[in-house]
Amino acid sequence: MATECPPKMILRKSEKLDKDASSKFLNRYIQTIERFQDEKSGSESVLSQLNRVLMYLKGEEIPLISLNLPVQGPPTEELIIPPEEMLETKEEESLKHAREENDDLHLDKETKKRLKKEKKKAARREKEEARKAKADTTQGVGEKEQS
């Protein structure tokens, strides 16, 4: 369903408006936009937002927004960690990573290159071993089927 857009309202004054003039302008705009408001919008509608601004400009008390959502507690499986503990674990992690990075800083360039190559070789060996182990298990299954 296509919704029509409200007509644009142009403010023809270049000077700053005071609260009364602003509220009058906003009130006119709200009246214009009311016809085009979709009542099925997800959260607070544009119209209700504008009405809240108008209430502020008029100096009225603004009610709290209620979304009529059911209040639910956390599921029993969920662990609730206080924010203080969260900060501590993040700091510990960042210190751990900083230590790992700083271990390589004091080494010279050649040593860093050598360590990098050794890490790559070790990773390659692990991959090859995993492939061989996988191939051995698939061959063993194939031989049993032939027997």
Swiss-Prot record:
**Basic residues bias locations:** 112-124
Basic and acidic residues bias spans:
87-111, 125-135
Query: What keywords are assigned to this protein?
Result: DNA-directed RNA polymerase, Nucleus, Phosphoprotein, Transcription
Q: Please give the residue ranges the record annotates as the region Disordered.
A: 71-147
Modification(s) after translation = Phosphorylated.
Subcellular location as annotated: Nucleus, Nucleolus
**For bias kind Low complexity, which ranges apply?**
74-84
Is Lipid biosynthesis among this UniProt entry's keywords? no
Q: What does this protein do?
A: DNA-dependent RNA polymerase catalyzes the transcription of DNA into RNA using the four ribonucleoside triphosphates as substrates. Component of RNA polymerase I which synthesizes ribosomal RNA precursors. A14 seems to play a role in the stability of Pol I subunit A43 and association of rrn3 to Pol I.
Q: What is the official name of this protein in its record?
A: DNA-directed RNA polymerase I subunit rpa14
Q: Which source organism does the UniProt entry give?
A: Schizosaccharomyces pombe (strain 972 / ATCC 24843)
Name of the gene encoding the protein in the UniProt record: ker1
